[in-house]
Amino acid sequence: MDLTWVTEGRTTIAVPCQNPDVPFPPGTAPVFYNSRMALNRDSTVLVVRQTHPHSYLDAMAASGIRGCRVGYETGVPVTFNDRDQLAIDLITHNVQSLGIKADITCRDANSLMSDEKFGFVDLDPFGTPAPFIDAAIRSSGKYLGVTATDTAPLCGAHLKAGIRRYMARPLNTEYHTEVGLRILLGNVARHAAVYDKGITPLFCYAHEHFVRLHLQLKSSASAADKSIARLGYIHQCPKCPYRLEEQKFFPGIHTCPLCGASLTPTGPLWTGSTHDPNILAGMIEDAETFIAGDPSGLLKLLALCRDEPDISFSYDYHKLGKFYRLSPGPIDVLLNRLRDKGYRAGRVHYSGYGIKTDAPLEEIRDCISS
């Protein structure tokens, strides 16, 4: 296996050489490494630095970059696991090169997580994490990280696959990214409740081709009940921009008050907060000084998440203007007008044209046309 050295964050490891002349170079290497996921791993390092778990499991380690960064940049003891012996050989090489404290296992991830417990369990599979979530919850002592790259099923483009994997009905709307994030959160919350565990989102977001969750788990029936109480649905009008959030385990039947159409429900999904303000504030402060290289992209994401209103859906600013046949001005002007009227309003972290507000559509329209 031909290797090359890469530096990500403060960590330098060896990774297999890739063919740069194909559409997806990481797929050409004998052991997987995707440089496009560096921001994902940056955020994980910052969360681990805020939470200080006693141990960390990189359950599908591949090249080992995630676990190597956690071990080298936080000092937390890491267990690396992969079922591919080539990956294990590469991880061993990288661990020895970095001199970090680590255990390395070559097992099926579900089998390992069923047998052992870790302070922080991290799932970063190729594709859906759905087959691993149950075992990960049982294995986690306190913290859980989940990456999903199957955004088409999560966000409603592949409806049947989304229903099969996540036992929820996705919806391919203008805010489908938000739907995907909250469906994944809701799925984890339901799995956790089976074991009398509740979830608290620490920093959860959607970026480019993936959804990323960082969660704290609390073991108690009351914590599980509180999580279940935060499950609900978004009801979307198929004919106009009206939408309704409903915190219920089973969806009601609703009619659009503006045009009379039957609303389409999506869910069950998480309707609670997607981040912890204290964790996020600590991550922002840490990122400014700790993350090596240019942290501007990560800092922008963190700031957008910090300022994003705690609302389960968003509007596409341009589509609102088109629907109302108005020429919208700058987004920030609209947001300031809504805030001046006493409404919550802000940008979303996953779209340059997305806005969140609790203002009714009539008020939004009036503020656009002012």
UniProtKB/Swiss-Prot annotation:
Catalytic activity, EC: 2.1.1.216
Keyword Coiled coil appears in the UniProt entry: no
Residues at which Zn(2+) binds: 237, 240, 256, 259
Record InterPro entries: SAM-dependent_MTases_sf (IPR029063), Trm1 (IPR002905), TRM1_arc_bac (IPR022923), tRNA_met_Trm1_C (IPR042296)
One Pfam family it belongs to: TRM
EC class name: transferase
GO molecular function, one term: tRNA (guanine(26)-N2)-dimethyltransferase activity
SUPFAM superfamilies: S-adenosyl-L-methionine-dependent methyltransferases
Catalyses which reaction(s): guanosine(26) in tRNA + 2 S-adenosyl-L-methionine = N(2)-dimethylguanosine(26) in tRNA + 2 S-adenosyl-L-homocysteine + 2 H(+)
PROSITE patterns: SAM_MT_TRM1
GO biological process: tRNA N2-guanine methylation
Residue span(s) of domain Trm1 methyltransferase: 4-368
Key words of the record: Metal-binding, Methyltransferase, RNA-binding, S-adenosyl-L-methionine, Transferase, tRNA processing, tRNA-binding, Zinc
Binding-site residues, S-adenosyl-L-methionine: 41, 66, 82, 108-109
Job description of the protein: Dimethylates a single guanine residue at position 26 of a number of tRNAs using S-adenosyl-L-methionine as donor of the methyl groups.
Entry similarity comment: Belongs to the class I-like SAM-binding methyltransferase superfamily. Trm1 family.
Name this protein carries in UniProt: tRNA (guanine(26)-N(2))-dimethyltransferase
